[in-house]
């Protein structure tokens, strides 16, 4: 529509939520696919192809114009058409320019300058006014809402303390103190009455009829008890009595120790949501899956590379002796641990009922990672170590993984920005970067890293290299002489294509479910090579003895069979296919998968003879789901099996919910994770004894077990 009168009357509000990538999700269903922002208010909702929450908002509020965040086009509900014109202020043009800058901009990590962290959005101008008169540059990305909230809370505490010391404050506190005293007295009387009632009930209860108890009571009755007067205690001097009284320091220490002893996990370990920071659902789903893989999680709970990267990058450390350097590094690790693992608490709370373990809604249950990196040395291993400790501490229901996102932006530039990304590509890139980081750290200045730490790095590297590593046998058979040529190739996942009957885009194909075993059958089936393209060594070796003619090519067939099974089997279902030159469409066929997978039919003969039948069985551990109809848009969630609670969890960014295996089977799977069931000696054959001895839960010394607000 070239001209819409409703757009000409539009007045875009300042500080609209569309300018904040963290709010690019539907306020009703939390999806990030087909997001429409109302231009008359700050409401954000999904489009008509999802659940029509944007249309329902128009029907309730009569706000006509909405703006699509990803594709950046406007739509008028009253005109029922897309809008091409703009208002007099040029708000739509400015909005498109701003969103294009947000999506295409490279986001550097901001380093504090003069103890002030520069904010960007309109909300953080309040923080700047509160902190000082410094101007706010518009080209910085991170926000400081959490820091502003902390300063406001601290300022409120300071003013409240000052007010309580004043005459007016003390006078106002008298009625409150009287009510508290009366409340404590009533509670004490109620407790006494309850104790007296229970005592009376016990006295009126008839004796038990048990023969065993009667026999023991008769035996006890024959024992004569002679009372003996205890000698009086020696008189204590006044000085000793005074010294025996607890001091204020003793009372404080006892209070802290009692609180630590009584502390219980507030949520089930591992049931921690990850906030969507702007189209980061692909990262959140992959991180949830990796944290629920027991072997992978234990490795990174044990290993932290940050302090050793700092030592290796220091020029001054090279001049020190080996013992002095290692001692300083260890001291730096212990003293700087709390500082490096800094988080900011937020007042968000909540999980679905049944997962919080009785957590109080008033308690701070969200951790917000600092906007700047936790260390000047970017390390994905370090960020995984910190994140897994928080997620499996049982203390936090929600985490905002800013530091992890900034490390991904810095070390994997292809995922920089707020554009839609593919979870499978991100998983492959993340594992590749982690592997390279472990390899380079182990070989970088080995004299500065203790032997035990180098051994631990080697063990973790071995796990990362082998947990997903498998091998398949590529066998080519010459149809002229039946000679077979075998080649061993490695794989870290199996990309499975849909059978031919599901490749068409008709409704009949989409209505018929596909079995994951059918896709494995297609992967291992015998494939005929087109034409005479195979150069058979056997045929050419016989011909060269009797003739000098050129090389002869023959027809052949090829088959792939698995010869080495991985510890964790990743099955990537190739749902996206090219349609035309530049368009990739999704195959929306439902794939049927079971909780147990038998890989015996897909292995070669040598593997079948070498392994026991139980070694071919795999249990489903996690599933990554893609919601939506296209490659460039959609939403990722994950189903993960929580071994601590013994239940399945649906991880939808910050929203986590308990689910059944039937719900998992109904999901539209994109990546399947199966863990090998049988091991040789009762535990994982890839996990070293040093890692096995480590607890699954992080240490209570981490920041995850603290409710203190950190800057």
From Swiss-Prot:
Widely expressed. Highly expressed in lung, pancreas, skin, liver, stomach and intestine. Its EC number is 3.4.19.12. This is Ubiquitin carboxyl-terminal hydrolase 44. Disruption phenotype: USP44-deficient mice show a significant increase in skin tumors when compared to wild-type mice. In addition, they are prone to development of spontaneous tumors, particularly in the lungs. USP44 loss also causes chromosome mis-segregation and aneuploidy. Zn(2+) 2 binds at residues 26, 29, 46, 53. GO terms for cellular component: cytoplasm; nucleus. Zn(2+) 3 binds at residues 38, 41, 57, 63. One of its GO terms (molecular function) is zinc ion binding. It comes from Mus musculus (Mouse). It is an enzyme of class 3 (hydrolase). Dephosphorylated by CTDP1. Its main location: nucleus. Residues 171-202, 239-251 have a biased composition (Basic and acidic residues). Residues 170-251, 685-711 are annotated as: Disordered. It catalyses: Thiol-dependent hydrolysis of ester, thioester, amide, peptide and isopeptide bonds formed by the C-terminal Gly of ubiquitin (a 76-residue protein attached to proteins as an intracellular targeting signal). It is found in: Nucleus; Cytoplasm. Belongs to the peptidase C19 family. USP44 subfamily. Interacts with the N-CoR components TBL1X and TBL1XR1. Zn(2+) 1 binds at residues 4, 6, 76, 79. The active site is at residues 281, 635. A zinc finger (UBP-type) spans 2-99. The gene is Usp44. Deubiquitinase that plays a key regulatory role in the spindle assembly checkpoint or mitotic checkpoint by preventing premature anaphase onset. Acts by specifically mediating deubiquitination of CDC20, a negative regulator of the anaphase promoting complex/cyclosome (APC/C). Deubiquitination of CDC20 leads to stabilize the MAD2L1-CDC20-APC/C ternary complex (also named mitotic checkpoint complex), thereby preventing premature activation of the APC/C. Promotes association of MAD2L1 with CDC20 and reinforces the spindle assembly checkpoint.
């Amino acid at each position: 529509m070239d001209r819409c009168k409703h757009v000409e009357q539009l007045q875009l509000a300042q500080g609209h939520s569309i300018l904040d990538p963290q709010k690019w999700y539907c306020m009703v269903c939390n999806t990030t696919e087909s997001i429409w922002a109302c231009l008359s208010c700050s409401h954000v909702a999904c489009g008509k192809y999802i659940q029509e929450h944007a249309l329902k908002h128009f029907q309730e509020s009569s706000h006509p114009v909405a703006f699509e965040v990803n594709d950046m086009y406007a739509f008028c509900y009253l005109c029922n058409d897309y809008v091409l014109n703009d208002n007099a202020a040029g708000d739509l043009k400015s909005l498109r320019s701003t969103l294009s800058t947000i999506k295409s901009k490279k986001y550097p990590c901001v380093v504090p300058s003069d103890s002030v962290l520069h904010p960007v959005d309109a909300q953080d101008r309040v923080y700047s006014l509160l902190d000082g008169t410094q101007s706010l540059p518009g080209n910085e990305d991170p926000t400081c809402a959490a820091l502003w909230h902390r300063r406001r809370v601290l300022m409120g505490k300071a003013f409240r303390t000052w007010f309580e010391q004043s005459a007016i404050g003390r006078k106002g506190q008298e009625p409150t103190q009287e009510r508290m005293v009366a409340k404590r007295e009533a509670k004490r009387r109620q407790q006494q009455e309850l104790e007296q009632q229970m005592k009376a009930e016990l006295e009126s209860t008839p004796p038990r009829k048990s023969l065993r108890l009667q026999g023991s009571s008769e035996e006890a009755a024959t024992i004569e008890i002679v009372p003996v007067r205890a000698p009086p205690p020696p008189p204590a001097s006044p000085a000793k009595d005074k010294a025996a009284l607890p001091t204020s320091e003793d009372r404080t220490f006892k209070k802290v120790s009692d609180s630590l002893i009584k502390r219980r996990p507030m949520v089930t370990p591992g049931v921690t949501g990850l906030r969507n920071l702007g189209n980061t659902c692909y990262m959140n789903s992959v991180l949830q899956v990796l944290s629920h893989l027991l072997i992978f999680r234990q490795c990174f709970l044990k290993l932290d590379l940050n302090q050793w990267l700092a030592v290796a990058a220091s020029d001054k450390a090279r001049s020190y002796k080996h013992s002095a350097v290692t001692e300083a590094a260890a001291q730096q690790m212990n003293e700087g641990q709390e500082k490096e693992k800094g988080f900011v608490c937020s007042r968000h709370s909540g999980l679905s009922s049944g997962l919080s373990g009785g957590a109080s809604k008033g308690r701070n249950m969200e951790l917000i990672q600092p906007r700047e990196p936790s260390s000047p040395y970017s390390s994905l291993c370090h960020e995984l170590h910190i994140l897994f400790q928080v997620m499996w501490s049982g203390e936090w229901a929600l985490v905002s993984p800013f530091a992890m996102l900034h490390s991904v932006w810095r070390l994997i530039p292809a995922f920089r920005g707020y554009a839609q990304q593919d979870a499978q590509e991100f998983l492959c890139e993340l594992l590749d970067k982690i592997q390279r980081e472990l390899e380079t750290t182990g070989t970088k200045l080995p004299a500065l890293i203790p032997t035990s730490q180098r051994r631990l790095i080697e063990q973790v590297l071995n796990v990362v290299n082998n947990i997903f590593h498998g091998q398949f046998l590529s066998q080519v058979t010459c149809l002229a002489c039946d000679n077979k040529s075998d080649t061993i190739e490695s794989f870290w996942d199996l990309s499975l294509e849909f059978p031919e009957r599901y490749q068409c885009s008709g409704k009949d194909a989409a209505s018929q479910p596909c079995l994951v075993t059918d896709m494995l059958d297609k992967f291992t089936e015998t494939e005929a090579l087109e034409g005479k393209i195979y150069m058979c060594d056997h045929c050419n070796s016989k011909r060269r003895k009797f003739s000098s003619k050129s090389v002869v090519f023959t027809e052949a067939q090829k088959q792939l069979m698995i010869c080495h099974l991985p510890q964790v089997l990743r099955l990537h279902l190739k749902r996206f296919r090219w349609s035309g030159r530049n368009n990739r469409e999704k195959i929306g066929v439902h794939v049927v998968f079971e909780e147990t997978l038998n890989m015996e039919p897909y292995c070669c003969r040598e593997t079948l003879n070498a392994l026991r039948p139980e070694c071919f069985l795999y249990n489903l551990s996690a599933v990554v789901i893609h919601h939506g109809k296209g490659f460039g848009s959609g939403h990722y969630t994950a189903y993960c099996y929580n071994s601590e609670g013994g239940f399945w969890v649906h991880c939808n960014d910050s929203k986590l919910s308990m689910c059944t295996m039937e719900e998992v089977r109904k999901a539209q799977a994109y990546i399947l994770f199966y863990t090998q069931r049988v091991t040789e000696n009762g535990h994982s054959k890839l996990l070293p004894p040093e890692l096995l001895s480590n607890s699954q839960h992080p240490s209570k010394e981490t920041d995850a077990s603290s409710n203190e607000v950190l800057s």
